[in-house]
A protein has these predicted regions:
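Flexible "cap/lid" subdomain of the alpha/beta-hydrolase fold that forms the substrate-access gate
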Residues: 5, 12-48, 52-212, 216, ...
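A short, Lys/Arg-enriched amphipathic alpha-helix followed by its capping loop at the start of a domain
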Residues: 1-2
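Catalytic active-site module of serine/aspartate enzymes centered on a nucleophile-bearing elbow/loop
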Residues: 211-245
Length: 245
């Protein structure tokens, strides 16, 4: 069998707020590698990430490739596909409007208002038709305080805006932005994802190296692991098994 760990990412309750306020992707990747070390992982370990977890696992695999046997990313594609979409795909720019809105201080108040109704709106758009009351409540609990909400918005500000970037991570940041994971990589994307369009995933497939695979999950939106858990789990287990030798 497998031993699995599912951590809360930095800044999401119940984790503490990072003292230096660093939420850049290199910081997320470094956290993942530190967790591997803390748990006593070896080179057979597999790293899996969804949404913000996806660039975190790509970065972890790039920075310390000896730690990870294979990589699984979901809902945010690798291989430069997102950067290309922001430049050449206006439909995706429109879908990603919230990322630009989050650069403004007003977003702290708007997102936090009315029992975080902003989150309900995003879920409705990203996974249309999926009833997720319990999952949404759990998500809201991780950003229920102003401090934790500001931390999560800090991810977007460090990526696209003027958010803090730790100078000590400059070299690591350049690597995670400019390189690709060398390990075998499985990328999964929901066919009804309203956050990132399937055309972005298909573009990623054209950029994928020979040791990678892209799968579009039928009947699923952005939160495919909740919407189609049996399909997603089967694909992941089969991928891990096929790359175990």
């Amino acid at each position: 069998g497998y031993r699995a760990g599912a951590p809360f990412m930095r800044g999401y309750a119940p984790t503490s707020i990072p003292a230096n306020g660093a939420y850049q992707t290199a910081a997320l990747a470094t956290d993942a590698n530190a967790l591997h070390e803390k748990l006593g992982g070896n080179s057979d370990a597999v790293i899996i990430g969804h949404d913000w977890g996806a660039p975190a696992v790509y970065g972890a695999a790039i920075l310390e490739p000896a730690r990870w046997k294979t990589v699984v990313g979901m809902s945010v594609p690798p291989w430069g596909a997102m950067g290309n979409a922001f430049i050449s795909n206006l439909n995706q720019v429109q879908r990603s409007w919230y990322m630009f809105f989050f650069q403004h201080g007003l977003s702290d108040f708007v997102v936090g208002a009315n029992n975080l109704a902003f989150i309900d709106m995003l879920w409705d758009q990203w996974s249309p038709g999926f009833s997720a009351d319990e999952d949404i409540a759990n998500a809201k609990a991780t950003i229920a305080t102003p401090e934790h909400l500001a931390a999560t918005l800090g991810y977007y500000r460090a990526t696209l805006g003027a958010g803090f970037r730790d100078p000590a991570l400059n070299e690591a940041q350049s690597l995670v932005q400019g390189e690709n994971p060398p390990q075998p990589l499985l990328y999964l994307h929901g066919e009804n994802d309203g956050c990132i369009g399937t055309e972005v995933a298909r573009d990623a497939a054209t950029r994928a190296p020979s040791n990678a695979r892209v799968e579009i999950i039928q009947g699923a939106g952005h939160f495919m692991q909740l919407e189609q858990p049996a399909k997603v789990n089967k694909l992941i287990v089969n991928w891990i098994t096929s790359n175990a030798s």
